[in-house]
């Protein structure tokens, strides 16, 4: 079976790396949750505040190759470019705008491409979206009924770029008094132990400090 995953990151933007790694992390965690006979090789827990979706990042299509058996077709020869995810069809062509038959929410700044009946690809960015009506930044020649793909989702990109993605390790903390001062032990989930002692004089606190100590030590992340 597979022991590692190679994620293409050369010359890719931060949003691509964030989205793709979060997607695979999510899928791996789903497998580990239902397979008690498997465990991950790394430690920690990844947290992200967006829903990863591979179709939102640069890709040249997807294939299962021979994973589920032999296939007649394994590649698309339509274009080497990233056409994005299908969202609908061109409903009406106006002088400065297009009406798209779609259930998706369209955003100012989105990028699209339209594939016509002759497999010609017309790509464009929009300045404005009002409902399902989009206003391209430049004039485009597309026909009614053409398949519309979105290859740049402005809102999704903003969400990924401003996300607080992090990886946290579970730590057990023990703080206790010694004859000469105090001692602090931290045990990471991978078994590593860090211990620090401090020699100092002691004075009785005017107020109980247990809750304050717990609060301060909980600020590790």
Predicted regions and their residues:
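Surface-exposed amphipathic alpha-helical tracts and adjacent flexible/coil segments at the periphery
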Residues: 1-221
